[in-house]
Amino acid sequence: LDNDRQSIVKNFSSLEPSQWSKRNKAHIIQNQTIHNKKILPHKLSFGSDYFYGKSSPNAPVIADGLFPPFSYARGGFSEGWGAAVLPPDDCDLEDWPIKSFHLKPYFSKVLEDLPYSACEDGLSKDFPLYSDDLKPIKLTKGNSTLLQSMSKSNKMQQDKIAFGQARLLTRANTDLLKPGCKYCGYCMSGCVYDCIYKSSQ
């Protein structure tokens, strides 16, 4: 991340969201890719695409047609991701020599050291929680209404569609060392409080 954005993020991390300057906030939440109709929008981190790999003289990329995104950043794509996390279903592992139950003890072990926003819901039957230490993010009124409407839908039950609250590697509550989610609403731009887990942490 460039020095200018790092400076703003550091400053904002010591303030409440209501104290952020409008000008600096606009600088780190901007995403010019959503205005370009010729390309798919990119997820950015504080307005920067620094974590996406690009061809360079020292690491040239030669490709015919579309090339999957890659990253040279420390922490890779977790530097800009949304931290969604679900265990694989057996249908996701059809070409693997193992089944999801073989991984169960390792999912539980990994989650011991990570912030985990999750709750028992309609996803749990197909996607076990693998943790008893659940600290779910509080849903907005709109999200709660959506989930309630889906729960009442006969169509969802007939088609056996699994749904529920997003499972996120996100620190919902303040702990001894770090603040929890401030519910500022800018998660998709990056979290100045480092509540969204990155593998570089």
List each language-model region with its residue ranges.
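Glycine-rich FAD pyrophosphate-binding loop
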Residues: 1-23
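Short, solvent-exposed loop/turn segments at secondary-structure junctions
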Residues: 5-6, 78, 85-87, 170-171
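Short, solvent-exposed loop/turn and secondary-structure capping segments
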Residues: 8-12, 83, 174-175
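Conserved redox-cofactor binding core of oxidoreductases
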Residues: 24-47, 58-63, 67, 89, ...
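Core domains of carbohydrate- and sulfate-ester-processing enzymes
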Residues: 48, 52-54
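Conserved phosphate/anionic-ligand binding catalytic regions in large, soluble enzymes, centered on
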Residues: 69-84, 187
